[in-house]
Amino acid sequence: MKVSLFVTCLVDMFQTNVGKATVELLERLGCEVDFPEGQICCGQPAYNSGYVHDAKKAMKRMIETFQDSEYVVSPSGSCTTMFREYPHLFQDDPKWADKAKKLADKTYELTDFIVNVLGVEDVGATLHTKATLHTSCHMTRLLGVRKEPMKLLSHVKGLQFTELPGKHNCCGFGGTFSVKMAQISEQMVDEKVECVEETGAEVLIGADCGCLMNIGGRLGRKDKNVKVMHIAEVLNSR
């Protein structure tokens, strides 16, 4: 099965280890992975800030970049959600409507792809630690990927898991929200940090780098000894 990696901006710029883990994991599961070098931002930050015209320029670039891909897989529920929104945004554009739908239909968040396309729940991972899981807003509320991460994590050997209190609450990142509404964002992430502490976890797992950077940064500033790991890194642990 051929898979094109949609790496996302945050992974490409700040968390390249997540991209590497994603590729290694997919290859171990029998996928042939390529990386279309024409990919840029999915357009979400510009779109959410109201710059629809500018956002669509990026979206068209991404549609063209992945037009020949069999499957597109991303280690981000948030950015995958943006791809799934393309058909709605281009529905009145005869030139791009069909292309946008084709891209949306073949694009998957990593855990969704592993469980529901590859049909795998045990990837053979081992990680001896105490952990909890933060579920991102876009991934659960908009993309509808809720059970897949835990289906995979439940098979990780050595992983002692505790459910995160208030797991459905936003961490306060929200892309530009954390900049435009910094004080509110700070209060939200402080609440999330308190919930993480309650679990006694040594590792906080997440599926979106934006959330992990936000919560991880706050944990660091408060001198909390909790490591953050993307779920791709956990599932790639041997």
From Swiss-Prot:
GO BP terms, alphabetized: lactate metabolic process
Lineage: Bacteria, Bacillati, Bacillota, Bacilli, Bacillales
Family indicated by similarity: Belongs to the LutA/YkgE family.
Species this chain originates from: Bacillus subtilis (strain 168)
A Gene Ontology term for the protein's cellular component: cytosol
Stated induction or repression of this protein's expression: Is under the dual control of the transcriptional repressors LutR and SinR, which allows the lutABC operon to be induced during both growth in liquid culture and biofilm formation. Is induced by L-lactate, which relieves LutR repression.
InterPro entries: Cys_rich_dom (IPR004017), LutA (IPR022822)
Free-text disruption phenotype from the record: Cells lacking this gene are unable to grow on minimal medium with L-lactate as the sole carbon source. Cells lacking the lutABC operon exhibit little or no defect in biofilm formation on MSgg medium, but form small colonies that almost completely lacked surface architecture when glycerol is replaced with L-lactate in the MSgg medium.
Residues passing through the membrane, by range: none
Pfam families registered for this protein in UniProt: CCG
Official protein name in the record: Lactate utilization protein A
Primary role: Is essential for L-lactate degradation and allows cells to grow with lactate as the sole carbon source. May also allow cells to utilize an alternative carbon source during biofilm formation, since it contributes to the formation of architecturally complex communities when lactate is present.
One Gene Ontology molecular-function label: oxidoreductase activity
